[in-house]
Structure formats: C-alpha cells, structure tokens
C-alpha cells in the first residue's frame, strides 16, 4: 500500500516562445517481437526507426518496467497523460463509491475522474492548445471520455462516432471497435484539419490516438 500524495509533485510548466503541435500515438500491445521480420512479413517499427534514430535512446530503455496493475488501457492513458499510476479502486471524485473498481466503470458511473490531478490535457489547454482524442473503441469504456473531457480535451471521438460517420461494417472488429488501419486513416485526415485550423487561428493542437 502507498499514498500517491507522498510522491506527487504539482507540475510547473514554462511555455516556450514556439508552441509546437503534438501528435501522440499509443501503440497498445506493441513489443519488440513485432520487429522480427522472420516471424512477420516485415519489421513493423521501420517507420518509427526512420523517424527517430536509436541514438535518441527510445528503442531500448534499460530497466524499464510496467508497474503492477498498469497493463490495461486506462492505466496506460493515465500514466502517460498524468504521470501517476492508476490504482484499481477509487477515481478521485464523482459519485462513485471508494470501492468502485476503475476497470468496471462507464461514463455514467462517475462525475469526475482524478479531478485533483493536473494532466497533459490540462497543461496544454492552459497554454492555448486544442486537444483531440481519437480511439477505435467506445469512448465510454472505463469512463475514458469522462477522464479526457475533465482534463482539457475538447473533442473525443470513438466507436459511436465512426458508426455515425458511415464506416464500413467490415472495418469494425466485433470484439473492440474500428480497425487500426481505418483509425489511422481518419487520424491523418484530422491532422490535416487541425493544421488548417491552426493556420487560421494560430491555436496549436494536440492529437492523441489510440
């Protein structure tokens, strides 16, 4: 048992003169095995390796470990967006009881999600960014939309939006949501849209894709 408050430091950010656009892509279940071209048709990470060289250090982080209980979608989102682990029970506010397991809630089950925590979306919003999240699965899964909209995200797109947009049925996985291929195609279009908007308004953007 531990208290996150014993370790938590409120972020202090000084904005630079140049506000760059940010595109963050979550490679859920991505691992080194996908680079083995003897097991697969090709090394899936070639584009990443070309974009950021090994000298940058990202391809091999010594002693890097996933924290206990951190191997599921919302735990990964919270860890990367907020810099804290997501404990299994209690969401830091709202109408959920303290014993509610974070893995079993929907958007209607909580009013707020880690309301006392400063996350990436909060910081970017305070610095004038437009924040957009795109996911292939349902936005209501594990109260994902509640978390995102409560932490600076202006637009959250998920399964219901892709169905409403007329995506072909064969492009959906019955056990999850929109295929990665179609999600990335939509993300590319969204980047173009956000770039055009940024040129008109001068407002930078953050696009997170999972």
Residue ranges of predicted features:
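Soluble catalytic regions of membrane-associated enzymes that act on cell-envelope
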Residues: 1-210
């Amino acid at each position: 048992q531990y208290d996150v408050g014993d370790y938590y430091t409120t972020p202090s950010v000084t904005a630079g003169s140049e506000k760059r656009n940010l595109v963050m892509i979550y490679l859920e279940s991505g691992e080194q095995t996908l680079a083995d071209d003897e097991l697969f048709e090709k090394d899936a990470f070639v584009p990443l390796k070309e974009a950021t060289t090994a000298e940058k250090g990202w391809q091999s982080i010594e002693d890097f470990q996933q924290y206990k209980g951190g191997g599921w979608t919302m735990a990964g989102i919270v860890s990367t967006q907020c810099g804290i682990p997501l404990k299994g029970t209690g969401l830091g506010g709202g109408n959920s009881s303290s014993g509610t397991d974070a893995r079993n809630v929907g958007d209607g089950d909580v009013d707020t999600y880690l309301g006392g925590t400063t996350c990436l979306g909060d910081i970017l919003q305070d610095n004038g960014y437009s924040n957009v999240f795109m996911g292939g699965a349902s936005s209501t899964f594990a109260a994902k939309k509640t978390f995102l909209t409560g932490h600076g995200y202006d637009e959250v797109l998920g399964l219901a939006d892709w169905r409403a947009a007329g995506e072909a049925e064969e492009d959906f996985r019955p056990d999850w949501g929109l295929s990665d291929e179609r999600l990335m195609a939509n993300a590319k279009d969204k980047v173009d849209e956000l770039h055009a908007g940024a040129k008109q308004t001068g407002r930078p953007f953050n696009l997170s894709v999972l």
